[in-house]
């Protein structure tokens, strides 16, 4: 990711897509050009947003999400670097990506063991770890952070100002 000359593009479907969108937002917030690619629109023209200098991160707990097929084929055809995050070692994503990150299979925390909960928490953790590792490599600092966060409670935390409050 550090050597990416273009953008870091994140994609996924369902809850994995929500995690992908969050990781892309985190990367943007530290000054790394990034966006979320909606896999349902990718094969309807949005693949044109990808460039050979980009790095693509695909999120899919099963690793076999059919909506990601066209993105994988396109990235392989045009030699776009891919990172795949999934939990099945024989899955399409793990087999097809340049850098496969294999997650352990986990039992979901809900009463029926099917609602993405433990798996999404783990996927979010891996995505955030990638972002933190990139920040360390970039020698990311508070001064750099201030550039991208001039407003809100995060800005208040480093400016020592107070947020306006509304009283009733």
Locate each region found by the language model.
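Internal, active-site/partner-interface "lid" segment
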Residues: 109, 136-161
């Amino acid at each position: 990711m550090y050597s990416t000359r273009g953008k870091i593009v994140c994609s996924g479907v369902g809850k994995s897509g929500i995690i992908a969108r969050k990781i892309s937002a985190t990367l943007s917030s530290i000054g790394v050009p990034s966006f979320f690619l909606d896999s349902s629109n990718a094969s309807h023209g949005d693949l044109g947003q990808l460039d050979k200098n980009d790095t693509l991160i695909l999120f899919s707990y099963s690793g076999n999400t059919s909506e990601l097929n066209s993105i994988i084929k396109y990235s392989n055809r045009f030699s776009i670097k891919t990172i795949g995050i999934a939990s099945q070692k024989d899955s399409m994503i793990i087999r097809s990506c340049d850098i496969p990150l294999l997650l352990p299979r986990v039992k979901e925390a809900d009463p029926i063991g099917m609602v993405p909960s433990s798996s999404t928490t783990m996927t979010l953790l891996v995505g955030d770890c990638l972002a933190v590792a990139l920040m360390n490599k970039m020698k990311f600092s508070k001064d750099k952070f201030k550039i991208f966060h001039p407003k809100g409670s995060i800005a208040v935390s480093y400016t020592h100002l107070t947020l306006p409050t509304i009283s009733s």
